[in-house]
A protein has these predicted regions:
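Structured catalytic-domain cores with a bias toward divalent-metal coordination
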Residues: 1-319
Length: 319
């Protein structure tokens, strides 16, 4: 069920009908791949890792309808957690984040090759052979709360440089992910400092705001442009959001992982609040006060889903 806070956000987006893309073209449903026949990287843009994050589906639908094709290398466009996406209901919009478990906490070989079973794991195992060959990934997401868009670049220098190359959005977060499991952007070589593979995860704004779809479309075409997969002229016809004059980078020290079923914040944080003093109480986990670990602490993506084992938020600092 949605939380009370979810209900304060109207659903201003309509999920596109993606049934026409079901067959795919490489033997994996809802995955389309185009090969230029020329040397170059395998680039992938993925959507609906979480089924209630509509902007990615809108962006990939836009790419496919406008026949995005690579000038070199290969381009894959994929709808990931389709089962969750198909269950989206505007009257209960948070319920379709996943069916059985979070699709974006499964991305280790141990989990993917293990004995567990779920709707999300079955789908992850289907798309794994495709992801294994991807060199550069843009994974499109959105957020529960109405805060500024974020580029989640990971803790490595290669991620920071990739985010800087993208140039959007203004805020780049250098983070370590979640204790509950590894994200797709951290899969294998993406999180290996010695691998040329690289991945970005963009959070385009609040889940159902129209602006999130505008940024998602812009990010998808801009990603292809900066990699030379399409021409500047092609990209220019689809770019809807101007890049900031300067990006700001937040280095994350880690998440706060919820321990009890009685977690709550002391204020309705939405994210990017900068708390001046270390030791400021921002919430309670049962009887334990949750405090900022250092001065000028930036609160990253405070969660409305407050379950034991989940990340309540991440702590960071502008660098």
């Amino acid at each position: 069920m949605p939380t009370k806070d979810d209900l304060t956000y109207p659903v201003s987006l309509t999920p596109p009908d993606i049934s026409a893309y079901r067959a795919g073209n490489i033997g994996v449903e809802y995955v389309h791949q185009f090969d230029s026949g020329k040397p170059g990287p395998h680039v992938m843009i993925s959507a609906v890792v979480h089924g209630n994050e509509l902007c990615g589906a809108i962006a990939v639908d836009h790419l496919l309808k406008n026949e995005a094709r690579p000038l070199h290398g290969k381009l894959t466009m994929a709808f990931m957690n389709v089962a969750a996406y198909k269950s989206f209901d505007a009257e209960n919009p948070s319920a379709s984040r996943y069916v059985d478990e979070d699709f974006n906490r499964l991305w280790t070989q141990e989990v993917l090759k293990g004995n567990r079973d779920s709707v999300e794991l079955r789908r992850a195992r289907e798309v794994k052979p495709v992801l294994d060959t991807v060199d550069l990934l843009l994974d499109i997401h959105s957020m529960q709360t109405a805060t500024m868009p974020l580029m989640m670049a990971g803790p490595l220098d290669k991620g920071r440089k990739f985010a800087k190359q993208m140039g959007i959005p203004e805020i780049v977060v250098m983070d370590f992910g979640h204790k509950a499991g590894r994200r797709m952007r951290e899969y294998e070589g993406f999180s290996d400092p010695d691998s040329p593979k690289n991945a970005l995860l963009i959070e385009c704004g609040q889940n159902w705001e129209k602006s999130s779809s505008e940024l998602a479309i812009t990010a998808a075409w801009r990603f292809l442009w900066i990699l030379g997969m399409i021409s500047e002229e092609t990209a220019a016809t689809h770019l809807r959001v101007q890049p900031p004059t300067q990006q700001r980078f937040v280095e994350v020290s880690g998440p706060y992982t919820i321990k009890t079923e009685e977690f709550s914040f002391v204020e309705p944080y939405v994210g990017l609040e900068e708390i001046s003093a270390a030791g400021t109480v921002i919430g309670y986990d049962g009887n334990q006060a949750v405090k900022t670990p250092y001065d000028n602490c930036v609160l990253i993506m405070p969660s409305l889903r407050q379950l034991p084992g989940d990340s309540a938020l991440r702590f960071g600092k502008y660098i």
